[in-house]
């Protein structure tokens, strides 16, 4: 018997657009099957398929081997697909929220988001509530009893960080948390629900290169090991040909747990500083290249 798929496709329609900041809009989607969707973590990843010109709904193959056949479609017949965070799910109401970063018409996702109107349709590849197995589509898995949390993210990972902070705020005894958050401009510093033990540092990028404010903040707040004592030898990852994705050991008992996500080149530089210069335990840090400047990862 074939294994049950942990993800399935959901056809949804845009119900409402909520402007969160100059660069961030929340799309509220609705669909008859959303009641069968589930989320397993505050940084739950999903895929969004966008219609090609002339399509009302993205045309994606069905069946067990749909993804292979989707990838085999000619470029002009393959609906664009991008990764997003499932921000909030109200399954009983048939609603799901996805936050979109707006960066002009440079890509199909932002272009769709800029022009989207209520009733416009997309497909979501999201965890199937009918499947008892885990989707494994999230990485926020801190060890029990961790005392310090470090969150490092650019605006593409801000929806995930918002969910993480909400989870921490709901705890009786939340850990001390430092969140370094790079955004396009000062107006993107949205209000987030966070525990009293959290410090949120907003880093407007302005004209700086992607990830530069984030790297500088990490270097300023987490100094290199004293006396030049370096961490373990660190292999380099070519972020132009490989996906930078390293998950922490959720069973490791240690004082610090870090979650780092954003532009892959910046995450690579932050990884180098935290592990090589600061000598932190790589088993306590999750590194994720959510995107790579000049390259499509999906």
Question: Positions of the model-derived regions?
Answer:
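Extended, composition-driven regions rather than compact fold-specific motifs
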Residues: 1-298
């Amino acid at each position: 018997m074939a294994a049950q798929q942990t993800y399935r496709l959901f056809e949804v329609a845009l119900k409402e657009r909520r402007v969160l900041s100059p660069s961030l809009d929340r799309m509220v989607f609705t669909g008859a099957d959303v009641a069968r969707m589930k989320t397993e973590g505050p940084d739950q990843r999903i895929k969004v398929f966008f219609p090609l010109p002339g399509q009302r709904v993205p045309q994606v193959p069905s069946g067990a081997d749909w993804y292979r056949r989707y990838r085999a479609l000619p470029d002009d017949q393959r609906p664009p697909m991008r990764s997003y965070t499932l921000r909030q799910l109200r399954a009983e109401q048939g609603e799901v929220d996805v936050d979109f970063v707006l960066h002009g018409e440079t890509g199909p996702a932002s272009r769709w988001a800029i022009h989207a109107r209520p009733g416009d349709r997309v497909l979501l590849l999201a965890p199937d509530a009918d499947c008892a197995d885990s989707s494994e589509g999230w990485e926020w898995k801190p060890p029990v009893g961790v005392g310090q949390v470090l969150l490092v993210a650019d605006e593409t990972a801000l929806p995930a960080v918002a969910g993480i902070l909400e989870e921490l705020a709901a705890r009786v005894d939340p850990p001390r948390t430092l969140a370094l958050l790079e955004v396009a401009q000062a107006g993107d510093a949205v209000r987030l629900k966070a525990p009293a033990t959290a410090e949120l540092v907003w880093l407007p990028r302005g004209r700086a290169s992607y990830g530069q404010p984030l790297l500088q903040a990490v270097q300023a707040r987490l100094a290199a090991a004293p006396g030049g004592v370096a961490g373990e030898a660190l292999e380099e990852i070519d972020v132009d040909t490989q996906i930078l994705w390293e998950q922490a050991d959720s069973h490791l008992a240690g004082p610090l747990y870090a979650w780092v996500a954003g532009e892959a080149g910046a995450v690579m530089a932050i990884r180098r500083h935290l592990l090589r210069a600061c000598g932190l335990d790589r088993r306590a840090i999750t590194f994720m290249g959510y995107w790579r400047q000049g390259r499509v990862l999906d």
